[in-house]
């Protein structure tokens, strides 16, 4: 047979010929889907198949009423090939390839003439048998419209899908022979009044515009698992015919709640779900838009959202289209009933109205609500139970593979346009952008592009012509962008560095041992499956280096999420506000696979005062609960606490909730010697004497004394001392030390 040269499915043989278009000789012949030529012309087509125009293949038959050089087409064929009677059209012999039989054919049915107020049921099994017999071995092409008669009524079917044997969904769907083994799926055209019954051959595909999902083309990156869950929970049952769902005895899911941190793609996913669906355009409600100053108007606005779905269900029943309603920032209008004190009760009425529409006495079965929020805790509980917004999908921060997909999506166009430099390594960027949300990654790309564009602009002469061809976004641009765009969630490096302004110095065996123990706990969090929560308490005298040690463990852990909770960031907060802030840090930590939380100076967080004694029981109970709370599945957390009042923590039972407690000691003479040698501000001969005086000294106090002594007797010597030009006078150092009464 001839080779494939038209869309991969065979082609014309012997070149095309121009023929004059005529009308089909008789009305009964118009329902055969064949084209008619003269007896002389049909000899030019060995397979009796012709490619008419450039899109459709018709079976040819000879007819005496057709003159030589003419081809007779019915009205629908002429309309689809865009010709009129008397026009000329190119006709080529079509040679089908091997394996040209259709495995699956999806047809959309409608009346030839639109009929009002008429509902008719068509048996899918009987209709499929007749169509196979009537159009056997004819070529069916996607988009083709074919008239036919069934039980005395004329109909038209449109080919929505034509799938060959062994053909994958990802390959182009075009045409093939209708055989006796071809599965046929029938779909009624919208508002046609036709109802297909006894449809058992395959799942319905009319729910979606596309036959497959390519999330990257939709601009969705890193959310394939979440999208799969949404499809399984909310759409899988809707793909099957209604009679299958009725036999299963289940109801469709009517609501999805997308929740998670800002910028992770909740709104994007809801918008793209709406674009995927056939039929009605989604209604998008931006939270407070439904509110009105008039009494009862707010509830009416909610009812109006469901009006189209109600009318559709009344007229079409189970065949009605799916109506999607998207609520952005749903927490603004669906707060827990009784939580707002505005005196009007309008927020409670909104929740009540939604509940009755979704799952009331006359509940609709053709609606799907998609709500989005980053405050799931504010929503009314009744709205979240099965039958309402029952599918809860957390849209979390993307992992490394997800970040790579997002970066590829946002750099795809510049790569196609050759604006992306070859030295840009997206894999490396994905690895370096831990805890970046999708919106922040988009911000990184925009920032990198701004650097590239700025290089082409002369600030001295803004009228200078721009050279578009020389625009290149380089790896350096992305590195600069990473410094400019920082993640809202992640390691608070600046806060951690403030805990060790002088770096981390080797202070001897005791401190080195504690650091190694801390890194062992980090490793335990990484690999352990049985202990997702590890807690550690560092106790010791004030200034002994507890905070610096905890911060160093956090920085060296290379965890994506490291946060420090200290009293200095909550000055002026009420007790309840402090509790809320502490809870928020823990909740954010649960969003990362590995996280570290440092509770710095726990006694200060608890507002402890020795006289009394006095402390905040609310904050104490909050910490006790959170330190025992196991993180969600797949999330591991290390909590490091520091305190100078271990006796107080023992008295309130706080020490018992920590897995291990380590004592951070003051410096001994040999430890002080190491630190002084590292600082290199004393003469070698004076180091031992200075270290002897610093025995049992907290390291923070040591640094303070050295800095005071470095000023010199009359001041102004610090720059020379730290520059290595001078050394601290040992006698002046002892003089400074003698002024310190207590350390």
Curated annotation (Swiss-Prot):
Highly expressed in stems, inflorescences and immature seeds (at protein level). Expressed in leaves and mature seeds (at protein level). Mg(2+) binds at residue 547. It catalyses: ATP + H2O = ADP + phosphate + H(+). InterPro entries: AAA+_ATPase, AAA_lid_3, Asp_de-COase-like_dom_sf, ATPase_AAA_core, ATPase_AAA_CS, Cdc48_dom2, CDC48_domain_2-like_sf, CDC4_N-term_subdom. PROSITE patterns: AAA (PS00674). GO terms for biological process: Golgi to plasma membrane protein transport; intra-Golgi vesicle-mediated transport; mRNA transport; protein storage vacuole organization; SNARE complex disassembly. It is an enzyme of class 3 (hydrolase). GO terms for cellular component: Golgi stack. It holds the Pfam family AAA_lid_3. Its EC number is 3.6.4.6. Keywords: ATP-binding, Cytoplasm, ER-Golgi transport, Hydrolase, Magnesium, Metal-binding, Nucleotide-binding, Protein transport, Transport. This is Vesicle-fusing ATPase. It comes from Oryza sativa subsp. japonica (Rice).
């Amino acid at each position: 047979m001839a080779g494939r040269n038209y869309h991969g499915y065979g082609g014309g043989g012997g070149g095309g010929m121009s023929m004059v278009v005529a009308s089909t000789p008789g009305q009964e012949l118009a329902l055969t889907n064949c084209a008619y030529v003269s007896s002389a012309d049909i000899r030019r087509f060995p397979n009796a198949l012709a490619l008419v125009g450039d899109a459709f293949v018709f079976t040819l038959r000879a007819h005496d009423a057709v003159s030589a050089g003419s081809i007779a087409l019915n009205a629908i064929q002429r309309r689809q090939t865009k010709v009129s009677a008397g026009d000329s059209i190119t006709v080529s012999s079509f040679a089908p390839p091997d394996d040209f039989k259709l495995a699956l054919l999806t047809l959309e049915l409608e009346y030839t003439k639109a009929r009002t107020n008429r509902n008719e049921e068509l048996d899918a099994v009987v209709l499929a048998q007749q169509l196979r017999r009537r159009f056997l071995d004819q070529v069916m092409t996607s988009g083709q419209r074919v008239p036919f008669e069934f039980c005395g009524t004329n109909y038209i079917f449109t080919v929505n899908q034509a799938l060959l044997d062994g053909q994958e969904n990802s390959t182009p769907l075009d045409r093939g022979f209708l055989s006796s083994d071809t599965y046929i799926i029938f779909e009624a055209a919208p508002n046609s009044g036709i109802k297909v019954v006894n449809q058992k051959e395959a799942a319905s595909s009319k729910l979606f515009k596309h036959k497959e999902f390519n999330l990257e083309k939709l601009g969705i990156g890193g959310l394939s698992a979440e999208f799969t869950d949404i499809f399984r929970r909310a759409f899988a049952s809707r793909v099957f015919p209604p009679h299958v769902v009725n036999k299963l005895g289940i109801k469709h899911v009517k609501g999805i709640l997308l929740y998670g941190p800002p910028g992770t793609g909740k709104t994007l996913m809801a918008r793209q779900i709406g674009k995927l669906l056939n039929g009605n355009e989604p209604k998008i409600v931006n939270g407070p838009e439904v509110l009105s100053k008039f009494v009862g108007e707010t509830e009416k606005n909610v009812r109006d959202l469901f009006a189209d779905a109600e009318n559709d269900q009344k007229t079409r029943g189970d065949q009605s289209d799916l109506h999607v309603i998207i609520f952005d920032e749903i927490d603004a209008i669906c707060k827990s009933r009784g939580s707002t004190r505005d005196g009007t009760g309008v927020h409670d009425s909104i929740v009540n109205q939604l509940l009755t529409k979704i799952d009331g006495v006359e509940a609709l079965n053709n609606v799907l609500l998609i709500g989005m929020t980053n405050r799931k805790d504010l929503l009314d509980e009744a709205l979240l139970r099965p039958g309402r917004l029952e599918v809860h999908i957390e849209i979390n921060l993307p992992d490394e593979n997800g970040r790579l997909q997002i970066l590829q999506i946002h750099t795809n166009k510049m790569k196609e346009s050759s604006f992306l430099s070859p030295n840009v390594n997206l894999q490396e960027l994905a690895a370096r952008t831990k805890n970046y949300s999708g919106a922040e990654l988009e911000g990184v790309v925009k920032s990198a592009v701004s650097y590239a564009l700025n290089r082409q602009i002369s600030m001295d002469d803004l009228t200078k012509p721009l050279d578009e061809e020389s625009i290149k976004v380089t790896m350096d641009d992305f590195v600069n962008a990473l410094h400019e765009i920082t993640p809202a969630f992640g390691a608070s490096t600046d806060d951690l560095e403030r805990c060790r302004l002088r770096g981390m110095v080797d202070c001897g065996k005791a401190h080195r041992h504690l650091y190694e123990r801390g890194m062992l706990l980090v490793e335990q969090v990484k690999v352990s499956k049985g202990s997702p929560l590890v807690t550690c308490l560092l106790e010791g005298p004030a200034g002994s280096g507890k905070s610096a040690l905890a911060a160093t463990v956090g920085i060296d852990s290379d965890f994506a999420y490291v946060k420090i909770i200290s009293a200095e960031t909550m000055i002026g907060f009420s007790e309840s506000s402090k509790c809320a802030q502490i809870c928020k840090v823990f909740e954010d930590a649960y969003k990362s696979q590995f996280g570290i939380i440092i509770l710095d100076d726990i006694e200060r967080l608890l507002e402890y005062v020795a006289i009394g004694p006095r402390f905040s029981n609310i904050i104490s109970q909050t910490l006790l609960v959170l330190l025992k709370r196991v993180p969600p599945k797949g999330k591991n957390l290390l909590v490091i606490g520091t305190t100078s009042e271990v006796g107080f923590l023992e008295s309130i039972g706080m020490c018992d909730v920590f897995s291990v407690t380590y004592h951070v000691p003051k410096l001994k003479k040999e430890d002080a010697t190491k630190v002084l040698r590292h600082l290199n501000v004393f003469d070698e001969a004076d180091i031992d004497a200075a270290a002897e005086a610093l025995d049992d000294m907290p390291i923070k106090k040591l640094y303070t004394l050295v800095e005071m002594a470095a000023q010199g007797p009359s001041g102004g010597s610090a720059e020379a001392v730290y520059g290595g030009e001078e050394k601290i006078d040992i006698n002046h150092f002892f003089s400074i030390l003698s002024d310190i009464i207590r350390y």
